[in-house]
C-alpha cells in the first residue's frame, strides 16, 4: 500500500431529548438529532489532482467532489442542449460561453455529494390507552449523480429502453423554455453526455416510521387472566418530500438502477400473561 495524501475530516453531532408534557393521562416526548460533516483533501502524494470516475480528487476540495461538464440548458430556438465551455483564463477563472458540442466543454469540479446536515426527529405521544410515535429523517445540502441518465434521458439516441417522465417537458417548438432538449430519433447531440444535467439534490424529509397502538383496559384483561394486550399498526417509509423524486433521495454519490426502499405496513397483537 502507498500513502496517497492527507485529508481532514471534521464534524459535529447534536442530540436533544425533551419531556414536553407529562400529566396523568397524557405525555409527549421528543428526540432530535443533527449531524454536520465535511472533509477536505489537504495534500496528494504525486499530483495536485486526478480524476476518479465521476469524481475529482483535488487538493483543497472535498473528497467526493463531482467532476463533469456544466450543463447550460436548452437553446430556445433550436432545442439543442447547451454546455458552458469552462476554459480557464490566465487568472484561473472559468469562461461561461455556451456551446452545443460537448467536446468543447471542459469538465470542472462541481458539487460535493456530502449532505451539509442530516438527522432525525422523533415524537412519542401517550393518551390513556392510545400511543402514537413517528420518526422523521432528513438530509439537506447533498447531491447525487444519476448514472442511468444516459439511457433514461438520451433525448432520442436510443428508443429501445424506457425513458424518464422528464421527457414530457422536452423542447418541441421555437420559443419553448425548458431544460430538456428536443427528442430526435438517433440523436447524437442530445444532453445525455456526462454533465451536471444528471446531478440532483438529495434534500429530503422522510416519514421513516409510524406506530399507532391501542392498549386494552386492565379491568377487561383481569377477567381473562391477561396482564396486557395491545394491538398496533406500524409502517415504514410512508411519505417522502424530496427536491428530486425520480429515485430514492437517500442514495448519494453515483446512482444507477437501484431498487428503492419499500413501504411496509404491519398489524400486530401483543399479549402478556
Predicted regions and their residues:
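C-terminal beta-signal and terminal closure region of outer-membrane beta-barrel proteins
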Residues: 2-9, 53-80, 163, 170-175, ...
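Conserved small-residue
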Residues: 3-8, 12, 19-113, 153
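Hydrophobic, lipid-facing positions within transmembrane beta-strands of outer-membrane proteins
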Residues: 10-16, 117-123, 130, 207-212, ...
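Transmembrane beta-strands of outer-membrane beta-barrel pores
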Residues: 18-20, 34-40, 127-129, 138-142, ...
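Repeated loop/turn-to-beta-strand initiation elements of outer-membrane beta-barrel proteins
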Residues: 24, 129-134, 219-220
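Outer-membrane beta-barrel and related beta-rich outer-membrane complex signature
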Residues: 28, 39-55, 141-170, 241-248
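Membrane-embedded beta-strand positions of outer-membrane beta-barrel proteins
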Residues: 30-32, 134, 231-233, 269
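Extracytoplasmic gating/loop element in the C-terminal half of outer-membrane beta-barrel translocons
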Residues: 139-230, 235
Amino acid at each position: 500500500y502507498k500513502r496517497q495524501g492527507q485529508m481532514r475530516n471534521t464534524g459535529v453531532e447534536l442530540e436533544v431529548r425533551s419531556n414536553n408534557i407529562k400529566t396523568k393521562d397524557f405525555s409527549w416526548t421528543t428526540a432530535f438529532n443533527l449531524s454536520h460533516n465535511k472533509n477536505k483533501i489537504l495534500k496528494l502524494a504525486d499530483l495536485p489532482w486526478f480524476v476518479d470516475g465521476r469524481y475529482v480528487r483535488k487538493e483543497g476540495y472535498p473528497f467526493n467532489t463531482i467532476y463533469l461538464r456544466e450543463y447550460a440548458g436548452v437553446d430556445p430556438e433550436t432545442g439543442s442542449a447547451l454546455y458552458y465551455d469552462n476554459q480557464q483564463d490566465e487568472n484561473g477563472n472559468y469562461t461561461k460561453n455556451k456551446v452545443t458540442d460537448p467536446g468543447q466543454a471542459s469538465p470542472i469540479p462541481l458539487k460535493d455529494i456530502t449532505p451539509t446536515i442530516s438527522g432525525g426527529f422523533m415524537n412519542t405521544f401517550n393518551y390513556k390507552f392510545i400511543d402514537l410515535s413517528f420518526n422523521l429523517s432528513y438530509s439537506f445540502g447533498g447531491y447525487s449523480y444519476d448514472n442511468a441518465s444516459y439511457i433514461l434521458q438520451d433525448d432520442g439516441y436510443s428508443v429501445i429502453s424506457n425513458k424518464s417522465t422528464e421527457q414530457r417537458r422536452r423542447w418541441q417548438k421555437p420559443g419553448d423554455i425548458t431544460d430538456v432538449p428536443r427528442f430526435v430519433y438517433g440523436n447524437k447531440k442530445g444532453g445525455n453526455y456526462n454533465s451536471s444535467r444528471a446531478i440532483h439534490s438529495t434534500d429530503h424529509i422522510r416519514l421513516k416510521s409510524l406506530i399507532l397502538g391501542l392498549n386494552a383496559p386492565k379491568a377487561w384483561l383481569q377477567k381473562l387472566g391477561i396482564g396486557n394486550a395491545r394491538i398496533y399498526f406500524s409502517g415504514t417509509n410512508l411519505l417522502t418530500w424530496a427536491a428530486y423524486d425520480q429515485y430514492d433521495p437517500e442514495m448519494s454519490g453515483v446512482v444507477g438502477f437501484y431498487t428503492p426502499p419499500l413501504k411496509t405496513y404491519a398489524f400486530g397483537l401483543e399479549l402478556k400473561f
